[in-house]
Amino acid sequence: MRRFISELILIGVVIIWGLAFIWQNIASKVLGPLTVVGLRSLIAVIFITLVAILVPSLYKSQAPKLIGEASSSKKLWLGIMCGVVLFFAMYIQQIDIGMTTAGKAGFITVLYICIVPFIGVFLGNKLNKFFIIGLILAVIGFYLLSVKEEFTLELGDVIVFISAIFFGVHIIVIDYSALRVNSMFLSIIQLVVVAIFSLGLAMIKETIILADILSVAAPLLALGILSSGLGYTGQIIAQREIPPHTTSLIMSLESVVAAIGGVLILSEHIGIREGIGMAVVLVGIIISQLRDKKSLKPKQE
């Protein structure tokens, strides 16, 4: 039952992230990418901290499952490690803007669904045939959904792939840390790191004007509270029960949600190819869950 609830939480997070591209696009038209990432992270830190203070019972309910395994200093370092990895994933992805097409970038980014299981195998996790079949179908589906032109490898594509590696590593380090650190504390620390790095670089590389920030206050608040605050905290809570390779597959649905959101909200068009791609992704993810609990190495309790 806890696993099912965690999967529902992660699906909710994916829906938020899939729709967040609208706010991201609005904010990015006025502010630089580092400024957007830094401010949304700062807003998220304030939001989560206020919730922890005002609802202490909620904070206590997120106590680590492996009590006593990590000292206070280790918990802090785990949070910093998660934040550093997340920052590089987000920043490297931003570097690629304009260097490749959005479709190719979307496809290459979700290749972390392959990277995470690959890393997991070296860490001792076992994958069953259903997961492998589902993974292959998901990759094919994302290609149909995202790549609309001939696929040729360029520098921008390599940069996106590097960011995908960092996103995959982030899922792995969250999987380790979530069992040892309070979920809300871990979320706060990692977002503090992202905010410091992003705003620090933004002050050097970008021009920050208060009037510009105020002009996109609404999308920034939505990004900070919903996408970063609830989103990354929800991911940590969910990963206490869900193995990392399953997490990566569920999180990859963000691209599908974004495509559907584009149709419903921005009146974008989805053709037969993209529709087939989304269907193949969904079928692949459903297949990947068959007999999942029987073949996976159980998580530590």
Name these PLM-found stretches:
Residues 18, 22, 49, 83, ...:
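Hydrophobic/small/kink-forming positions within alpha-helical transmembrane segments
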Residues 1-38, 84, 88, 92-95, ...:
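Glycine-/small-residue-enriched transmembrane alpha-helix faces in small-molecule transporters
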Residues 41-42, 49, 53-57, 216-218, ...:
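C-terminal-most transmembrane helix of multi-pass membrane proteins
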Residues 48, 127-147, 167, 198, ...:
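Hydrophobic transmembrane alpha-helices of multi-pass small-molecule transport proteins
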Residues 35-46, 94-125, 163, 245-263:
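Specific alpha-helical transmembrane segments that line the substrate/conduction pathway
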Residues 20-21, 49, 56-108, 142-144, ...:
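Specific transmembrane alpha-helical segments of multi-pass solute transporters/efflux pumps
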Residues 39, 105-111, 174-195, 228-264:
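Helix-helix packing/entry segments at the starts of transmembrane helices
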Residues 5-15, 61-92, 155-163, 202, ...:
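Loop-to-transmembrane-helix transition segments
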